[in-house]
Design a protein with these regions (language model features):
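Conserved acetyl-CoA-binding loop-helix of GNAT-fold acetyltransferases
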Residues: 95, 101-114, 141
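Conserved beta-strand in the GNAT
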Residues: 62, 68-77
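A short helix-loop-beta-strand connector motif used in the catalytic cores of GNAT acetyltransferases and
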Residues: 51-62
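A short beta-loop-alpha structural element at the N-terminal edge
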Residues: 11-23
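Conserved GNAT-fold acetyl-CoA-binding loop/helix
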Residues: 24-50
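Conserved active-site alpha-helix within GNAT-family acetyltransferase domains
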Residues: 106, 118, 130-149
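Conserved beta-strand-loop-alpha-helix junction that forms the acyl-donor binding cleft
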Residues: 126-135, 154-157
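Conserved GNAT acetyl-CoA-binding A-motif
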Residues: 117-127
Length: 167
């Protein structure tokens, strides 16, 4: 379905292997925005292996304006047992600050919604930090709702290893 060009010259396209440095830059910029730069473990090597290797675990779309990458979205498919359909999960979306308010994020979200429909997904979902009010308002303007009855849980690092070794 993509690439797609808008009247304003914005192009959405699927990322390819040569875009790995761009993807890593977006990940680092997002981490800085979210005050989590110290948490980034991604490298060009890990991105190559996990996004463009033998088993790609996720996909990336890039938004380009005047041949410059200004936004990205990384997503993958999950599955809902209740609706018995795949879902589309948006792991990250980020638009560089100088390009916000121009409809770039909205166009990426519309594209992902259309992709979810084309793939017969039962839902399109993502997480957002509670302090990130600008993003929460943006998502609500698209028709998204917060899932107040749900809490995100995670096991990682040493606890993940400990849990696995206890099997």
């Amino acid at each position: 379905m993509i690439p797609r060009t808008t009247d304003a010259g914005l192009i959405l396209r699927k990322a390819v292997e040569k875009d790995i440095p761009l993807i890593l830059n977006f990940i680092k910029a997002l981490a800085e925005y979210e005050h989590m730069s110290d948490k980034v473990l991604a490298s060009e090597e890990t991105i190559r292996k996990t996004l463009f290797g033998e088993t790609p675990y996720a996909e990336v779309i890039l938004a380009e304006l005047e041949k410059k990458a200004v936004g990205f979205a990384l997503f993958f498919h999950n599955y809902s047992t209740f609706v018995s359909k795949p879902g589309l999960y948006l792991e990250d979306i980020f638009v560089y600050p100088d390009y916000r308010g121009k409809g770039i994020g909205k166009l990426m979200m519309k594209y992902l919604a259309k992709l979810a429909i084309e793939k017969d997904c039962g839902r399109f979902e993502w997480s957002c930090l509670t302090w990130n009010q600008p993003s929460l308002e943006f998502y609500k303007s698209l028709g998204a709702k917060t899932m107040d009855d749900w809490v995100t849980l995670r096991v990682d690092g040493k606890n993940l290893l400990k849990l696995a070794e206890s099997f």
